[in-house]
């Protein structure tokens, strides 16, 4: 079994203190910083552009796990790579040529992730699983933080684990959306090894980030 890693979503951070919030995550044992990038078009919200990521990366040694919810995604891959993204995750619905976008991210020396919305089936990406580093399973409809976890997506994680075994391929399975101390356990049991969490990490136990990260890791 892979080591459980935590990728806190800064969508739930105090944006007026973003640099300090990332420092707290680093000190609290976060494995990645999860950055949700939204364009108001592919999803109904607007968030973080490349200059913000570039500024935040200057004083941070943790890898940036950048989730691009933008369309057309291909034209923005270079900008987010240059800004400091270490992992770039894209949606198959947001690119005209998923194979080409995966290739571009790899050529830039970045790890590549592909995200599945709650309604997107695993077979959409089955031919690409040997070319990617990570599959991100969305357990809410993307666009806003603080939504309720959708347990029905766990079947996709189990399906991915089965494919890994049958085809002898390896990639991380990340889950994002409504993750808390209760459902993190069933997500891990299903086969997820990276948990994205925002509200639980920043708001639970009076904002005790280290405690909250430790609790999620030991689910």
Predicted segments — roles?
Residues 33-50, 92, 140-146, 201-204:
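Glycine-rich, proline-tolerant flexible connector loops at the mouths of alpha/beta enzymes
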Residues 22, 74-82, 120-132, 177-195:
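Catalytic cores of alpha/beta
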Residues 17, 59, 75-76, 86-172:
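Conserved anion-binding
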Residues 28, 59, 83, 108, ...:
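Structural motif
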